[in-house]
From Swiss-Prot:
Its main location: virion. It is found in: Virion; Host membrane. It is a single-pass type I membrane protein. Residues 75-82 are cytoplasmic. InterPro entries: G8P (IPR008020), Phage_M13_G8P_capsid_dom_sf (IPR023390). It comes from the Viruses. This is Capsid protein G8P. The lineage of its organism: Viruses, Monodnaviria, Loebvirae, Hofneiviricota, Faserviricetes. Gene3D superfamilies: 1.20.5.80. The chain crosses the membrane at residues 55-74.
Amino acid sequence: MRVLSTVLAAKNKIALGAATMLVSAGSFAAEPNAATNYATEAMDSLKTQAIDLISQTWPVVTTVVVAGLVIRLFKKFSSKAV
């Protein structure tokens, strides 16, 4: 008898969990654009931030490359002058 009540309690919990999942899925499906808009907004924001960081990085990269070339040329010409 005790085993039967345990099995029935487990079945009730499973049924309650399944009903909760169905209601949750139904309410999520009621707003079809909600998830899509959040994902789209997040990706757009990430893309904007990446473009901003890249545009801020280019001046630094060019400065480092030009400085490296100037140092290399200075070393080359200073060693020939001596």
